Amino acid sequence: SRGLGDVYKRQVNQQRKLLRIAGGTKFIFTIHDFNFLTEKKPWKAKMYLRRMQNKVNKAAVVTTISHYVADVIRQHIDLKGKEIRVIYNGVERIDMLEGTQPSFATGRPFFFTIGQIRRKKNFHLLVDVMRHFPEYDLYICGDAHFAYAEEVRNLIREKQVTNVFLTDVITQSEKIWLYRNCEAFLFPSEREGFGLPVVEAMQFGKAVFAANRTSLPEVCNGHAIMWEHLDTESMV
């Protein structure tokens, strides 16, 4: 434990106030990302940043999930001389598990992507990309209750693209089937603290195409085709 003695470790939402901890208790604080800086209103982002600084001030150890996030921490947080320890996210082995074919699968060859349907994921870029691959379908899967999801649906309708399907949330077994049977995994996300889906896709030996942004070059580590420019001409 490198002289830390007994250390208290529990999952704490990085934006919430620090829970009351017994005096003298050492604890580890893990920072996952700084998405709030671009996703929240300025006053709220400042509040979250103050809360994060308060936790760092009191933490015995600060950890994070990628060297990319570690660099962002150094830009926005006074570490008080503390070291940041990078501990990559653990990834469950799912490639040996059974999958279930989703009811929406058409039987045609397909590409796959997954994640919350939020603007930072850049799923709208894939609509135009798929116009260049009429012989393939694309399944965009994930929590679609965000306003951006409706923008993607509208774009699909406006451009009359018939081979892109925004499916909403899927089960674990459906996800496994899609990873196992897709022709390639596409991940044009603009901001990731880690990027778990690209690692999951690699478990199945799939070709991964990902944005050369934030943590993704680090996590893909030369095992993916990286999109340098996020425009249709460059991505196809």
Predicted regions mapped to residue ranges:
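Carbohydrate transferase catalytic cores enriched for Leloir-type hexosyltransferases
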Residues: 1-236
